[in-house]
Swiss-Prot record:
This is Major surface trophozoite antigen 11. Pfam families: VSP. InterPro entries: EGF-like_dom (IPR000742), Furin_repeat (IPR006212), Giardia_VSA (IPR052798), Giardia_VSP (IPR005127), Growth_fac_rcpt_cys_sf (IPR009030). Disulfide bonds: none annotated. It comes from Giardia intestinalis. Residues 1-17 form the signal peptide. One of its GO terms (cellular component) is plasma membrane. It is a single-pass type I membrane protein. Glycans are attached at N591, N630. Residues 663-667 are cytoplasmic.
Length: 667
């Protein structure tokens, strides 16, 4: 029967003796699995299989006087603890192959340590004061290649931790960590769920594969978003990209983030803001503000924005003035970039000089002004009834001789003879158009029956006109409900943005319409694309499909676009803001939400980047300045009130003095 010598050190396995209190020395019991064993017996006893037996009557212990290496146990390989600690033992009683979670130290002999736990934390002595040690928290390991010298314990190499992550830096030492040290990230391999600390620069070749980031000193592992790394800190002279996926050289100073292509600054250190591709110092708390009065105070007023932004009437900074509505990018009295109101009456957009570029519907550009169209037109090129370029809903446009403008009137009516319509079977934008002509050799061209001699363009192929319809249009024209249509004119341009050059089919349908097999299909309200009139496949902006509905529901008034529910906004409507990332509800600029404070009278805003504090209000109700705060810290409304009061006081004083001197003169 083979026995092996096992060595136990009072450590994390230590247990108070409960079963051998009369024979085992106090505090010399340990647990191996669920079994309590004694590692050092009272005088006259020796531990065999963890139990104290009479030393003189037991031949299994070759040396019962060991005192240099206390806590040794001889154990049979057929029972606990022997079969728990060792799988193979030599004839002289030395374990040669340790069980899982244990290792055989180098140069073990029958009178010294034969097997030790991978998680042993206390140095263990061999002959000649050689020492070895396990790794705290280690589950499986390999033995050191050679024993350490005195006072320098040689550590086992851990291959898997009981919990936490296995950390094995390049020098070959190993440890088990709850969190990986800086420069590493915790990776759980698909195979065996092995947890290891992997280098930020090296990544992991074990599944799931993770690509490392060169020159990264500190990283975060994003397991939920595709097993990717983001770098929080790069090596000297390098900075992470804005998305933190690379470390790059920077061309500028005071950069916090730099691009991988060219090294341009993408973000700045604290106390600096990005102006173009450079970081400039700024003490202002207003976002994207370069210069201000009363920096960081409650009455701070931005006086100049960074080069890519413009001052709003409320002294905030925005990149695009058009976001404020009827404003354009201009300059203020100090020649600083600022958003200016387009003051041309009935103008929709102004250029950078404040000149009108496009007029509102119902008006046309007349020099520098917007003049009214004829009341019958929706849009026009001039002011007469024959200058309409688009008609109101329910009215049809009849083009004049030049083919660019015409008159708006009632839609299709039926009649008899040449040029008359037999069936008004097509409706677009509320107006009816002809689908079958009364004369057999005529067909609807742009919705109107036209005789052969009156046609300026042969839109129907020869020999394809019969029974008042066209069965095959000339390539480049749209065949729709018995007629041929130009997609550059109404009503064709209402439903199709272009016909195929080699066919008479629609190349790009206008959202809300579909032309299939020469028939117009009108999608349900709010639907951009559909398979038929009642089955929507994609809703338009401002609408959403709810659950399994085949139609679209209008978004809440707080949403410009929404998804899944009417109040779940993707983009907020003007006058509203979101406090959460992604899709969520929008709150009025005037109201508070989740730590963000609204501003009464605010018409256009954004949440603060810090997610707390007041909204960034870009436009206020009332005056053109929007009640902006000026350098004194008073709103323009307050200043106006003070000015009026001052005028009244001065006028009263002058009147009093006049009366006084006149009366005194008479006296």
């Amino acid at each position: 029967m083979l026995l092996a010598i096992f060595y136990f050190v009072i450590s994390t396995l230590t247990a108070k003796c409960t079963t051998q209190t009369q024979t085992c020395e106090a505090e010399k019991c340990e647990m191996v699995g669920e079994t309590e064993i004694c590692t050092r017996c009272q005088t006259g006893k020796v531990p065999i299989d963890g139990k104290c037996v009479d030393a003189t009557a037991n031949a299994n212990c070759k040396n019962a006087s060991g005192d240099g290496d206390a806590n040794q146990v001889c154990g049979k390989m057929s029972s606990v603890p022997g079969n728990t600690l060792c799988t193979t033992v030599s004839p002289d009683g030395v374990c040669s192959v340790a069980a899982n979670e244990y290792f055989v130290p180098p140069n073990a002999d029958a009178t010294h340590d034969s097997v030790v736990s991978c998680s042993e934390e206390t140095p263990i002595h061999l002959a000649n004061n050689k020492q070895y040690i396990g790794v705290a928290g280690c589950a499986t390991c390999s033995a050191p290649k050679a024993p350490g010298e005195d006072n320098t314990p040689k550590a086992a190499t851990c291959t898997k931790c009981a919990a936490g992550f296995l950390h094995t830096p390049s020098e070959g030492l190993s440890s088990c960590e709850e969190t990986c040290p800086e420069g590493y990230f915790g990776h759980t391999a698909t195979a065996e769920s092995k947890k290891t600390c992997k280098s930020c620069t090296g990544g992991s070749s074990e599944a799931p594969n993770v690509k490392g980031i060169g020159d990264c000193l500190k990283c975060m592992y994003n397991e939920a978003s595709g097993n990717t790394l983001t770098c929080e800190k790069c090596s000297a002279q390098k900075k992470p990209s804005l998305d933190k996926t690379s470390c790059n050289d920077c061309t500028g100073q005071n950069c916090a983030f730099c691009s991988s292509s060219g090294g341009d600054c993408e973000g700045c250190d604290s106390g600096f803001i990005l102006d173009g591709q450079n970081c400039v110092k700024s003490d202002c708390k207003t976002e994207n503000c370069k210069a201000c009065t009363n920096p960081k105070a409650a009455n701070e007023v931005c006086t100049e924005c960074i080069s890519t932004h413009h001052l709003t009437p409320t002294s905030q900074c925005v990149q695009y003035c058009q976001a404020l509505g009827n404003y354009y990018a201009g300059t203020n009295a100090d020649n600083k970039k600022a958003c200016k109101e387009c003051t041309v009456a009935n103008c929709k957009t102004c250029n950078d000089q404040g000149q009108c570029q496009t007029c509102n519907d119902g008006f046309y550009k007349n020099g520098d002004a917007c003049s009214p169209c004829h009341e019958s037109c929706k849009t026009c090129s001039a002011g007469t009834a024959s200058d309409c370029t688009e008609c109101p809903t329910g009215k049809a446009l009849k083009y004049g001789n030049d083919g660019t403008k015409g008159t708006c009137g009632e839609g299709c009516t039926t009649g008899q003879g040449s040029g008359a319509c037999k069936t008004c079977g097509l409706t677009i934008d509320g107006a009816s158009y002809c689908s079958e002509c009364d004369t057999q050799n005529e067909y609807p061209q742009n919705g109107i029956c036209t005789s052969t001699t009156a046609r300026t363009v042969a839109t129907c192929k020869n020999s394809n006109v019969a029974n008042g319809i066209c069965s095959s249009c000339t390539n480049g024209f749209l065949r729709m409900n018995g007629g041929c249509y130009e997609t550059t004119k109404f009503p064709g341009k209402s439903v199709c943005e272009g016909a195929n050059a080699d066919a008479d089919t629609c190349k790009a349908p206008v959202p809300g319409y579909k032309v299939e097999a020469g028939k117009l299909v009108m999608c349900s309200k709010g639907c951009d694309t559909c398979s038929d009139a009642t089955t929507c496949t994609k809703c338009g902006d401002g609408y959403t499909k709810i659950e399994n509905s085949q139609t679209c529901t209008k978004c809440d008034s707080s949403c410009e676009t929404c998804t899944g529910a009417a109040t779940t906004c993707k983009v907020c409507a003007t006058g509203y803001y979101k406090t959460a990332l992604g899709e969520s509800t929008c709150t009025s600029c005037e109201n508070d939400s989740n730590g963000v404070i609204g501003v009464k009278g605010c018409l256009n805003c954004a949440p603060p980047s810090s997610s707390t504090g007041s909204v960034l209000c870009y436009l206020m109700k009332g005056e053109n300045t929007g009640g902006s705060v000026n350098k004194s810290g008073l709103s323009t409304g307050a200043i106006a009130g003070i000015s009026v009061a001052a005028v009244v006081v001065v006028a009263g004083l002058v009147g009093f003095l006049c009366w006084w001197f006149i009366c005194r003169g008479k006296a």
